Amino acid sequence: MNLEPDPKDEAFRQELRAFIREQLPPDMAARGKRDFHPRKDDLVFWARTLNAKGWAVPHWPVEYGGPGWTPMQKFIFEEEMRAGFAPAVDRIGTELVGPVIYTFASPEQKAKYLPEIRNADRLWCQGFSEPGAGSDLASLRTRAVRDGDHYIVNGQKTWTTEGHHADMMFALVRTDPDAKAQRGISALLIDMNAPGLVCRPIYTIDEGLTVNEVFFDDVRVPAENLVGKENAGWSYAKFLLGNERTNSAEVPHTKRDIAQIEEIARIERKNGRPLIEDEKFANRLARIKIDTLALEYAIYRVLADEGEGANSVASVLKVRGSELRQRVADLAVEALGDRGVAVAPDPEGLHNMRDTFGETPVPDYGVGLAAKAMFRRATTIYGGANEIQRTIIAKTILQL
């Protein structure tokens, strides 16, 4: 694997940076820098800005609107978007649901939904986890019973990310209660405004709103919204989760957060010296940087193989990436000392820029760090708990 920078890739990187400087509004970049949960209008604005450029869905094939980039260009794109503090687009739609639709859905569904996803005309959430079905997803109980040209859906989903913003849900439902757990599941596309569907917020430990619980009470879903074949939904779910776990390494996010820690450590002082000069702190930061670089090279290896074998290492990337994000967030809070624990949300779930701890105001560069560290506790759980991922690694890679 050649790790020397390609001049073409460097030119592409500079093009991305110029685009972000010209197109990203300063107030939006400021919110992104503080790692606020994205506002819906920010998300939609940026998705449409990217779509106008042909960059909204970098991972999609050209035939469905993708830009035709190399794997390395896709990685650089994500890296520069995070470094430039651009808001995340509808990643559930573009990176998870979209690929399922263009791979398994009918031509009519592709024609209807893919353009909407590219332009953020309708945002998406995924209905997988239930109160009794998290890591053991195949035990889900939400039922869908065929009634003429519709399915009647009853049940509950929980931890539904961005459900409060979503217009549509990609949901796993049980259509054959008598079949083996994994064989009686189907995938439905459900309108979040359908009668009988209720979405309720779940405020997490960071006091922000990103997840929800969704209730279905005789919700009628057109049968034409079935993805692929009835009772074949488990295969589509595994495909989707493979993408989620590969993407959850989040190296661009981690590198951006490391740069923020270095900025803080140059300003904050310990024993009269910049914190960055403290040997213990510097060693911890160096260890994180080394581990991040190792993870980045692991991703480069997958990219060099044109993505072959990505599914087999998805669990490894998920485990390493999620644990790194927690370590980085915790170190950032520690760098601020006692002020690092301050959290005060405003009504939109954004972290108040006037956070204080006692009489000591939190500096601008420290706003939201405590909330971020709290939210990062979930990274080792969502997308498949790391304990489950280690079992997958043992079976599929180590052959234990």
Predicted regions and their residues:
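Amphipathic, small/basic residue-rich leader segments at the start of a protein or domain
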Residues: 1-91, 112, 116-119, 274, ...
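Glycine-rich beta->alpha junctions and the first turn(s) of the following alpha-helix
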Residues: 5-7, 197-295, 379, 395
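A structural signal for short hydrophobic beta-strand segments in well-ordered beta-sheet cores
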Residues: 142-145
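A short core secondary-structure module
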Residues: 149-150, 154-200
